[in-house]
């Protein structure tokens, strides 16, 4: 292997045991049966289509909350494909920068528009949803800067599987409670609002932690390079 290839090799760091356990389960049960002709980008596309169907279901759940079952199926499809596209790319030596970009782009679009869809459907208040919309995209942006500057693909502690499970719980609760509102200190709050607040706090914390950590490491790296 050339020195250039060694420099470009990215170290993957996954702190979540739930994420690693789920990935290994998928690799052993589904990954080994993926057809040889199927490419990582095709798997990513399947996940993106599943996610898109889930988003559409979230929009029309305004008329019937049971459409959120379709959203849950879309989340599961997207999550599975999000893990398997990387597995196929690595095991079949088909990794590419274009594929990595396509994967991350679909991740960001899926979560962003799912939040918007749930807000339009009335399950979560716009005032709360607007604070959650940028978080996942900023976490991915920060992760990409780890890759760019430190050659590390650092998964956040609250990674893809935790995010997808978060939305699955939200959908199940929204089907049960529909748009029921409770009043706390004069504020009208829905079930999804509570879930968004409880889930949003650690997500914001994780985003800020990763950004500060990256800044400190880059400053340290700059000082070491000057010496």
Feature locations, PLM:
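Membrane-embedded alpha-helical segments that form the functional core of polytopic membrane enzymes
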Residues: 44-98, 114, 190-203
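Membrane-interface helix starts
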Residues: 36-46
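Hydrophobic residues within alpha-helical transmembrane segments
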Residues: 49, 73, 102-105, 169
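Residues that define the loop-to-transmembrane-helix transition and helix capping
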Residues: 41, 69, 97, 126-127, ...
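Alpha-helical transmembrane segments of multi-pass integral membrane proteins
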Residues: 16, 43, 74-75, 103
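A feature for the membrane-embedded catalytic helix bundles of lipid/isoprenoid biosynthetic enzymes
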Residues: 2-34, 104-227
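Acidic active-site catalytic centers that drive phospho-/nucleotidyl reactions
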Residues: 82-85, 103, 107
């Amino acid at each position: 292997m050339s020195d250039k290839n060694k420099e470009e090799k990215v170290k993957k760091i996954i702190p979540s045991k739930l994420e690693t356990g789920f990935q290994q389960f998928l690799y052993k049960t589904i990954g080994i049966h993926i057809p040889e002709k199927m490419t990582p980008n095709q798997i990513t596309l399947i996940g993106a289509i599943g996610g898109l169907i889930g988003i559409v279901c979230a929009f029309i759940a305004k008329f019937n909350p049971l459409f959120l079952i379709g959203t849950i199926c879309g989340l599961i499809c997207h999550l599975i494909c999000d893990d398997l596209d990387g597995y196929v790319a690595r095991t079949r030596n088909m990794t590419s920068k274009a594929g990595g970009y396509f994967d991350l782009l679909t991740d960001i679009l899926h979560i962003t528009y799912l939040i918007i869809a749930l807000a339009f459907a009335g399950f979560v208040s716009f005032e709360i949803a607007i604070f959650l919309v940028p978080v996942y995209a900023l976490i991915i942006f920060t992760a990409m800067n780890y890759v760019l500057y430190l050659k590390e693909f650092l998964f956040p502690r609250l990674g893809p599987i935790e995010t997808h499970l978060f939305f699955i719980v939200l959908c199940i609760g929204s089907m049960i409670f529909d748009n029921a509102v409770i009043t706390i200190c004069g504020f009208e709050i829905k079930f999804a609002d509570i879930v968004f607040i409880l889930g949003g706090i650690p997500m914001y914390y994780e985003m800020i932690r990763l950004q500060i950590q990256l800044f400190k490491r880059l400053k340290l790296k700059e000082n070491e390079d000057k010496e």
